[in-house]
Amino acid sequence: MTNAKKILISGVKPTGRPHIGNYFGAMKQFVDLQDEYDARIFIADYHAITTVQNAEQLSRHTIDMALDYLAIGIDPAKTLLFKQSDIPEVCELGWIFNCITTMPFLMRAHAYKDAEAKNKEINVGIFDYPILMAADILVQNADVVPVGQDQKQHVEYARDIAEKFNRTFGDTFKLPNALIYENVKTVVGTDGQKMSKSYGNTIPLFATDDEIQKAVMGIPTNSQGIAEPKDPDTDNIFAFHKLFADEKEISEIEKRYREGGLGYKESKDILIANMKRFIAPLREKREAFAKDEEMIRNILKENGKKARELAHQKMEEVRKAVGIA
Ligand code: AMP
């Protein structure tokens, strides 16, 4: 029987604790869409080596990331949850893509340009990141890739590379599309910039109550008094309310902002209470899964085998098309 569902693929790098930007921008969609799609979610450990260069840390982060996925509701009976490195074929495909991609094309990537502008030391892995990402996506024949806005260009790169391959070697790859939800495409951090570990403005998805309290209290505010009307559209605390309050409460808070009468202290207290209520059950689920790491390793191992089998079939086609079968 053929599977009529469209194929979804995405992944997150195991570089430490995921933050609420990763969750609302991408990971939540993995859970919400796992019934509708043939969902394949991976732990991007090859990608993580560009920054995590310590074996113990990388394997710890990898198991941690599997726990994170299970805790937010990824169901391994519905979603193929696997480790990227269980499919070494992606490196082979990445090499083939390297050979049909020009340097100037990769030099136009935002992530590369940002790193260069900050004078960061850029290893070849970081420069070549879009190629490996294209291989992750295309080897699985994916239709859609749920990601945050910052990864949109990389999915477009995967499309461009697929087109180039198809033109050069014959029709082999489907052209994937990024799936980005407008309201969460860029989740802001405590300082109002995009939430990102490199800006030090994150709130961890599995934050403790103390961490939540400290992070929210640290959100900078201006000197407007309680009675003064405030603009919710430019307020950092309100941006978080939109993620953690229900619709009724959001509109009540919005009204009080515009009319005046809601001070920043009270707004922060409401946010802290809502965040704690949202995060506590996730943290508890995570702790429960963490009691059986053997089970986690088995899930990854079994799913890794299945994902590799799917990739293997695609690679047979690719090798034939290229002339290395
Ligand atoms: P990474 O940790 O770079 O592998 O990112 C994992 C996923 O989270 C990607 O789909 C990103 O686009 C998404 N993401 C990261 N930061 C944010 C953010 N601040 N807002 C929305 N999505 C984000």
Predicted regions and their residues:
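Short catalytic-loop micro-motif centered on adjacent basic/acidic residues
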Residues: 80-83, 146, 224
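N-terminal Rossmann-like or analogous alpha/beta NTP/dinucleotide-binding catalytic cores
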Residues: 2-135, 287
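Internal, conserved structured core segments that host functional sites
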Residues: 111-165, 169
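Short helix-capping/linker segments at secondary-structure and domain boundaries
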Residues: 103-107, 139-146, 245-253
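Conserved nucleotide- and phosphate/pyrophosphate-binding catalytic cores
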Residues: 22, 153, 159-325
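Short, polar/flexible loop-turn hinges at active-site or ligand-entry regions and domain interfaces
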Residues: 55, 145-148, 172, 227
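A generic structural motif
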Residues: 14, 145-146, 201
